[in-house]
Amino acid sequence: MNKYKKTYNVILDNMDLYEYRLRPISAIMYMQDAFARYTATKDMAAYNLFATNQYWIVAEFNIDFIKDLPFWSEEIEINIWISEITKLKIYTDYELKYKNKTFAKGNALWFILDKETKRPSKTDILTERFEICDELTLGEHKKFILPVATEIYTKIEHTNNLSDTDFNKHVNNKSYINIAEMTVPDEFRKSCRLKNLHIRFNKETFLGDTLTCTTNRTEKPYQYTHIIEKDGVSVCDIVTVWEQKSNKENIVEYNLEIKNEKQ
């Protein structure tokens, strides 16, 4: 089998602030969890690599949100697969569904790093344990390109706390996206939905580090860059593309839909 499938239910902690829907960041975390479970079936989980003085890192995520996101308690299905392996790089593609319809899809770039040198390890063992499925959800593994900023939109500072860190003792991926999300004004998020997120992780940061996140407008409407820096050096770059929410994207319409299904 060259695809791994896992189902989840949308829980309270993963809902957005307004419409009882799954937060986009939570969709990414479900995908990351599914990948971790997939690697465990091949004895390549984080704890397996720890014994060989290595660890997984994700370098990039690129994800499209193509339909309204599922509501609280609904079941979602994630399919994830290894789509490409080079000498040092590992690409995964993934698709998220609910009610048998795709609501998000994308890809991620991974490396296995040596703990001592912090350099990528060769991927020979992966080609032995994983089957390759060359199905590309976004058509290609697009290189991350940071658009030119035209003006600063918002800017905040954040000091990493205990809840930002993971078992590797560095700041986790979710926290960087949360920091960027905090720069998006409340009124904007009420009226717009996230259409695409492309993120590049550049450096690790740790407990107690102070980060600055600057969100910028670009030449394209509804496209923004989010630059997260430590001491003036970028640790994470994010590009987001947004669109106006549809009329169906509210809890009243959802309740009517559920009522009609029961009749």
Language model: regions and residue ranges:
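Acidic/His-leaning functional-site neighborhoods
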Residues: 152, 158-241, 245
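HotDog/MaoC-like acyl-thioester-processing domains
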Residues: 2-7, 62-146, 201, 205-207, ...
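Exposed loop/turn and edge beta-strand positions of beta-sandwich/beta-sheet ligand-binding modules
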Residues: 59, 90, 195
